[in-house]
C-alpha cells in the first residue's frame, strides 16, 4: 500500500506510528551528548556548505538552549564512499538496537538501494544511500533542495519539531533556475516568477 499509494504517486505522507516500537529516549540531545559527545561531526550552514568540524558536545553547547535561532546544523552520514571523513557508522551501530526498519517501508524489490525481489534489506543492518542523522538547534534550516538520486526521503523526527515544505516534482522549474533553488524566506520574484 505504501509503495502504490505514496511512493509511486509522489504523494507525501506522515506516518504517526512508524516509530512506536523504537526507544526514542536514545535519540535525545542529552543521551547523544553523553554517549557520543566526543565524536567529531560536520557542521553545515543552510546552503549545505561545510562550516566546521567539531565535537557533538560542542555543537550542543553552542546551539541548544539558546534564545537566538541556530544558524548551523549537523549532517552526519554513514559512509557513502571510500574517503577519510567523519562518518556516523559507529553511531548507527550503537543505536541499531534501539530502532528498526519501519514497518511500512519495503524490505525488497528496491531501486535505491538496489535489492532484487527474492532478497531483503534492512535499513538498520544494510547500507542505504545517505542514511544519516541530522541535528539542529531551534531555528536552523536547510534551503529548498532536491534530494540526490531522485530518492524518496524517509525522515524520522525523534526530538523537537520540524517544519517541512514539499513540492511536487512537476513544480521543479518554478523553484529552480540555473542550478539555484528559491529561498523560501526571501523569494526573488524576478528570478523565480513562477514560484508561489
Question: Predicted regions span which residues?
Answer:
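N-terminal accessory scaffold of Fe(II)-dependent oxygenases
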Residues: 1-196
Amino acid at each position: 500500500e505504501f509503495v502504490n499509494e505514496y511512493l509511486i504517486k509522489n504523494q507525501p505522507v506522515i506516518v504517526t506510528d512508524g516509530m512506536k516500537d523504537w526507544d526514542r529516549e536514545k535519540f535525545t540531545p542529552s543521551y547523544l551528548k553523553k554517549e557520543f559527545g566526543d565524536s567529531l561531526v560536520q557542521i553545515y550552514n543552510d546552503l549545505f556548505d561545510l562550516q566546521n568540524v567539531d565535537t557533538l558536545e560542542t555543537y550542543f553547547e553552542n546551539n541548544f538552549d539558546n534564545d537566538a535561532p541556530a544558524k548551523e546544523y549537523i549532517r552526519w552520514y554513514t559512509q557513502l564512499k571510500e574517503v577519510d571523513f567523519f562518518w556516523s557508522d559507529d553511531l548507527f551501530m550503537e543505536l541499531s538496537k534501539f530502532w528498526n526498519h519501519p514497518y511500512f517501508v519495503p524490505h525488497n524489490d528496491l531501486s535505491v538501494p538496489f535489492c532484487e525481489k527474492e532478497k531483503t534489506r534492512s535499513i538498520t543492518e544494510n547500507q542505504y544511500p545517505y542514511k544519516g542523522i541530522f541535528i539542529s538547534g531551534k531555528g536552523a534550516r536547510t534551503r529548498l533542495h532536491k534530494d540526490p538520486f531522485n530518492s524518496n526521503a524517509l525522515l524520522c523526527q525523534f526530538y523537537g519539531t520540524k517544519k517541512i515544505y514539499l513540492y511536487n516534482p512537476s513544480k521543479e522549474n518554478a523553484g529552480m533556475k540555473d542550478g539555484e533553488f528559491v529561498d523560501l524566506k526571501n523569494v526573488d520574484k524576478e528570478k523565480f516568477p513562477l514560484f508561489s
